[in-house]
Amino acid sequence: MNRRTFLKSTAALGAASVATPFIAHGAAREIIIAEPVHSTGYLPMYVAIANGYFAEADVTVKILTIETGAGHTNAVLSGQAFAFIGGPEHNAFARAKGAELRAVVHCVDRGNVYYCAAKGQEPTGTDWGAYLKGKSLAVSQFGGTPNSITRYLLKKWKLDAKSDVTLVEVANSAVLAVVKSKQAQIGVSTEPFVTQGVRQSVWAEPFFNVPKELGPYAYSTLNVRLDSIQKDPELVRAFVRGMVKGLKFTYAQPDAAADIAKKQFPTMPLEDLKATLDRSFKDELWSKDGTISRAAWDTGSAVVRDAGILKSDVKYDEIIDMSFVESVRTSL
């Protein structure tokens, strides 16, 4: 049984008994974090788990991978998971439906999205509207952040997402296969899939680098229910503290972080993993201290609003709570 199957099966077995977002065993607690894809982009979170930063507060963290557009968010709303990692725009979507979620610590501070052209389809200039018109783009499912960024950029480039291009919306991990099978000429992808596609000669190096083009971006934050903050702030604080320590360790000791990545992605060739991590460090993918800046949400908000996915202007303080990051910062 592979890791993902194990996680899904154990989560399913435990679903009936998980009425609250954590399970208490005396002083120890076990919490589940839902992720939309198992990605090197979330390395600081895996580092925090591997290094025992959550365990320092008697918290055990398990990862549940749910590859549907809003599945990771729904896992938190239903109480199956304590937190999800993903864009805080999902908190805004939930708020529009009457639910209250809060982003409490940052992870990915850049839009972890790269546009790659299939071999033989590479652009010759930088007029992206003219280049992309008439092409098929493989991208994550509607509601996922890569999909939102794509719709935002298409509008910026004066292209209609329905009539000027074809969006082949699939799971994040399936984008590479779609381009490889020639169902799309463009792959909208993240690491480690970008490097894998380059190594397999499916596509060339990215022609459009979102981390560099859009700058600070609230791309992947750790998000919890508001009632978790209200009912058990110490658990939230312990979780935030562990994440901040994971972020700091990743930047301070990249070689040691890479060793943890090897264990998380054991089937990935080492040269692919190295190239993936090199790109992530070069693009300053991760937050350095867990802070979600107002500028980062301004960009994230603009993306989902201009893409037509979020209809209302949701303010920073309505979906983001930095009080826990601020409270642990002085002690780290």
Regions found by a protein language model. Name each.
Residues 174-265:
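Pocket-lining segment of extracytoplasmic ligand-binding domains
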Residues 230-311:
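Secondary-structure end/capping motifs
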Residues 80, 85-88, 95, 139-141, ...:
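Sec/Tat-exported extracytoplasmic proteins
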Residues 301-332:
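Conserved C-terminal helix/tail region of periplasmic/extracytoplasmic solute-binding proteins
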Residues 41, 50, 69-72, 90, ...:
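Stable alpha-helical elements in mature extracytoplasmic
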Residues 56, 130, 211-213, 282-293:
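Short, solvent-exposed loop/beta-turn-alpha elements that line the ligand-binding surface or hinge
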Residues 27-160, 166-169, 183-191, 207, ...:
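Short, glycine-/small- and polar/acidic-enriched structural segments
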